């Protein structure tokens, strides 16, 4: 797994391609173009076309792409774009819950950054961390808290999320 520190990552919705160039010029360590949460369902195809056109017009650009979650009808098309476009340097896989999901994403021949953001993903963390194609692990604390029914203002909830964060950190060093 890559051990370099990513201090700053900017998420940019693919529905706003004019913001991609601005983000790339910001000095952020990583620019993640979002095809998932920041994009309404009825705009998914257009968002992917926007990103494809941006990368065609800017062959020097290097971005990560947060694809749609496993089992989402748009994920296969997202992975195809990532495979075809040399400007995509890694795939950010939301809602990762199994090594098989990671390996499916890695089949596009790009490194994968799975996001652990559910109780199932946390339980499957040892297998996910050993899956082929992983470059680094990431953590979705808000979604994990929602999945587990935790109150965002609870001290106990913060302790649980800290334990999850610690587990992800340990597995990222293996």
Outline where the language-model segments fall.
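Conserved alpha/beta-domain cores
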Residues: 2-174
